[in-house]
Amino acid sequence: MTIEKNLSDVQQKYADQFQEDVVKSFQTGYGITPDTQIDAGALRREILDDQITMLTWTNEDLIFYRDISRRPAQSTVVKYDQYLRHGNVGHSRFVKEIGVAPVSDPNIRQKTVSMKYVSDTKNMSIASGLVNNIADPSQILTEDAIAVVAKTIEWASFYGDASLTSEVEGEGLEFDGLAKLIDKNNVINAKGNQLTEKHLNEAAVRIGKGFGTATDAYMPIGVHADFVNSILGRQMQLMQDNSGNVNTGYSVNGFYSSRGFIKLHGSTVMENELILDESLQPLPNAPQPAKVTATVETKQKGAFENEEDRAGLSYKVVVNSDDAQSAPSEEVTATVSNVDDGVKLSINVNAMYQQQPQFVSIYRQGKETGMYFLIKRVPVKDAQEDGTIVFVDKNETLPETADVFVGEMSPQVVHLFELLPMMKLPLAQINASITFAVLWYGALALRAPKKWARIKNVRYIAV
């Protein structure tokens, strides 16, 4: 005879818990901390895969840095000569039977290049190298420092600016890059359109008029992809592989210009530093954010030709010192009405912080991506008497666009001067850690500014 007894809800709860504890297996579970690794889980080894997955760029992405030649420097300032023009040609060289032509000398000028100093410092505890690691921490830090220095050299070779300083007669820490060194008459404005064969031919012609031959073109991969997309409708390739599968599409790695063949290089990292990363946390010694006001000024020789570009212009400003950068300023907006209007940004930097600001970076928001793109860097030495930095946006640099640099990639035209090739320098040890720096001293030299061209404001696939 079985006697059944009804249990209350509370009694049933405790009965169920008791039943679970009685029949519970010796399980390993998924816990990864001592508090959650119990029973069989306490016996489980922690397994870390020995492969490090790289989710950022590597040295293989630094195309320009790999291509450019290097020349040793013997001083912190290097001089070189530029043969600008021959003597007079034409009617003045014709003379009478017993005559001689008047003296006509060639035009030769000296140029100087100041060496700049690039460094990346790493620090690791002694204990971090003694434990059972999947990789050597010292090697990881060394490879990272080399990559950082190489990337810095490549970025400065495109966009470096030696004028970015607070000293009125001084010189900034960067060396001048191609964007500053290329002859101003060789700057082609694409006005927000995609790269076309016409642009490349125009660049080749301008370089040819400077007695150079365009051999290489460097651009973000988004520009290169957009260039290929523009050709897909006019040319098509259908290829069959060994398995009978039909593939379409192609990669355009070069262009036959009116002046010869130009190699096309698509870079994955070229424009990265031109996009504002708002996720970065300012360092403790970073300047305070700037205070910015925006007003519309008329008759500023602006170029707001597209009406869609005139409404809701949004700006943010970042203050840069030698070692750190501030958080972005609060967003300021403006709307222009006329083509020749300009947006006047009045920027006030706070003087009460640890380090002297050297320049401000001005960003404008793109309408499609919503990201902020660098349109100008202004040195603090250009501030007005009241300390205000004024910049007028005339729509000369468009957000969501990029640059294409085309030129003659030969050692006689462009190269890096190296006072100190890249080296690893152990630093003083003041505690139980190891500190070292990777150094490089040098600068970019563009000996023939007319043998390179810059195509600016090129539309591209920005992601």
Swiss-Prot record:
<protein>
    <recommendedName>
        <fullName>Major capsid protein</fullName>
    </recommendedName>
</protein>
<keyword id="KW-0946">Virion</keyword>
<comment type="function">
    <text>Assembles to form an icosahedral capsid.</text>
</comment>
<feature type="propeptide">
    <location>
        <begin position="1"/>
        <end position="24"/>
    </location>
</feature>
<dbReference type="GO" id="GO:0019028">
    <property type="term" value="C:viral capsid"/>
</dbReference>
<keyword id="KW-0167">Capsid protein</keyword>
